[in-house]
């Protein structure tokens, strides 16, 4: 039993020691097909040659310098992320939660006396203080109340509620294009378009949390692209640096004008090792976009017998009428790693390199898991 390292999640009864492609291997040498990919982080699978070469090559040269100095990879990475997102500036951080914190600071500086955030019921934006304030899940949020930040929560895809929530004191609308921890619930195209329209009309900022949906997961680089809208601020993290800690906040020049130097900083963020790996990941991710869309449809078809499939690309879920944990356990015992969120929703976040044969392999294991 682990007596010193405090778990921050309900641990599965397995310890992994290595990985290759879409498979993990445990201490006993047993292999598992992984459709969780480190909660969406290991998007290129395990031991990917480009990622390994970048890590080992850069580790021999320079790992860390701190925010006091530049490095040869930070500006090219910032430029590429800005080009991809349609935005102008990038601020590097260590995680999705820290990206939320920095985004909230950007909103505060831009909006001045207007402080209210409109966010979504069921949303998740990290476990830091600011992230909890805008997370629309009472079980996670309430234990740390009260919060100084005023937040109005609205039901996803309820356009009437969204319209009613806007007032002169609203500074921003914060959304996930697909609510990840909230059950993999996609926002409707018209809803995201209305959010953009309302923010523009009221002078508020549109803030897209793309930590789970972004960087290829849905079959497009960003989830907001499905609606053809342009956010003012975008947060990214999870797969950005191939398993190394790195996130970023992307924002417009208009927002940048209101953000003083040193308003947010991080000792480790944007270092040469993580930034070099991120450049390799983004190049490979763009090449894989057609494959993500194609194999995502194959995965959805394989999941269809078990319930109405939700999501896009390789971010999929099946809501059940029974608890999901027993299915997760049965699948794991049979060599397949999946995830359950919101107690009854099976979630699938496989590596982008998942093959059609592996989709069929997963389907066969799931069939056995459901028959137990």
Where are these regions (language model features)?
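Conserved N-terminal phosphate-binding loop of PLP-dependent enzymes in the Aspartate aminotransferase
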Residues: 1-372
């Amino acid at each position: 039993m682990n007596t010193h390292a405090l778990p921050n999640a309900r641990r599965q009864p397995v310890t992994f020691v290595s990985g290759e492609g879409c498979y993990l291997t445990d201490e006993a040498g047993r292999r598992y097909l992984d459709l969780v990919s480190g909660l969406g982080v290991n998007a290129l699978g395990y031991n990917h040659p480009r990622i390994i070469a970048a890590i080992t090559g850069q580790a021999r040269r320079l790992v860390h310098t701190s925010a006091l100095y530049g490095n040869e990879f930070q500006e090219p990475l910032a430029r590429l992320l800005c080009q991809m997102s349609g935005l102008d500036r990038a601020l590097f951080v260590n995680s999705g939660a820290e990206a939320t914190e920095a985004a909230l600071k950007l909103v505060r500086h831009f909006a001045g006396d207007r402080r209210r955030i409109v966010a979504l019921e069921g949303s998740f934006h990290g476990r830091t203080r600011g992230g909890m304030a805008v997370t629309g899940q009472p079980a996670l949020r309430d234990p740390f109340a009260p919060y100084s930040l005023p937040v109005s929560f609205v039901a996803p895809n309820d356009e009437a509620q969204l319209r009613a929530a806007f007032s002169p004191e609203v500074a921003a609308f914060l959304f996930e294009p697909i609510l990840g921890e909230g059950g993999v619930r996609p926002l409707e195209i018209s809803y995201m378009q209305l959010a953009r329209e309302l923010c523009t009309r009221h002078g508020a900022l549109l803030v897209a949390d793309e930590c789970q949906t972004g960087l290829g997961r849905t079959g497009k680089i960003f989830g907001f692209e499905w609606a053809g809208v342009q956010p003012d601020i975008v947060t990214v993290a999870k797969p950005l640096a191939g398993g190394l800690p790195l996130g970023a906040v992307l924002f417009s020049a208009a927002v940048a004008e209101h953000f003083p130097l040193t308003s947010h900083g991080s000792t480790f963020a944007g270092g040469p090792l993580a930034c070099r790996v991120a450049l390799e990941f983004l190049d490979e991710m763009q090449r894989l976009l057609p494959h993500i869309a194609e194999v995502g449809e194959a995965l959805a078809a394989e999941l269809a017998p078990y319930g109405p499939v939700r999501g896009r690309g390789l971010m999929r879920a099946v809501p059940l009428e029974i608890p999901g944990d027993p299915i997760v356990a049965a699948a794991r015992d049979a060599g397949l790693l999946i995830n359950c969120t919101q107690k009854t929703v099976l979630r699938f976040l496989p590596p982008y390199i998942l093959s059609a044969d592996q989709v069929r392999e997963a389907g066969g294991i799931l069939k056995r898991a459901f028959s137990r």
